[in-house]
Amino acid sequence: MEKRIKIAGYQPQGSILSQSLNIFSKALANDTSNIKTEFTFNIMDNGKAPEEIIKLVSDGAYDVGYISSSYFAKKIPELYIFDIPFLIKSRQQAYNLIEGPYQDQISAEVSEKYNLTLLSIWDYGFRHFSNHEYPIKTLADCKGLLFRTLLNDLHLKMFASLGFKAEMM
């Protein structure tokens, strides 16, 4: 009997996140011949916001989805560790963190607070600033510059403290 797994994301098909979903799908296909995957690479194309993936997977509309840790951080504040600038000094330090007891703790909290199963925490790189006004070279360059960020209270406070006019997307 064939099993269908519906997978959702919030990036265009060519993004690194969507490419990762393809790799995940191929791994499933290699392990079992009776699993077929269906993708919705970008739920925003269907009028859904990225944070809705949590509810869509919880409610069974999708079986698998990826989401930024920022969207879970209100109920699991330990995830804010990924949003504090300069706290994690290297990629290796991040890997050591997410491959140990920390991931087990977060996994248990995701299960308890969201009724979801955490498959993994992955490295999504580092944040950079860009804008169409002027280069940011000093702290003064941040003053009043509009900056959009994820739905994350820590981001709003942090960017506002730097002088940005921060707003959530």
List each language-model region with its residue ranges.
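Sec/Tat-exported extracytoplasmic proteins
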Residues: 31-32, 61
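Short helix-initiation/N-cap motifs at beta->coil->alpha
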Residues: 40-55, 134, 151-154, 167-169
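Short, well-ordered beta-strand elements
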Residues: 1-17, 21-25, 35-41, 143-148
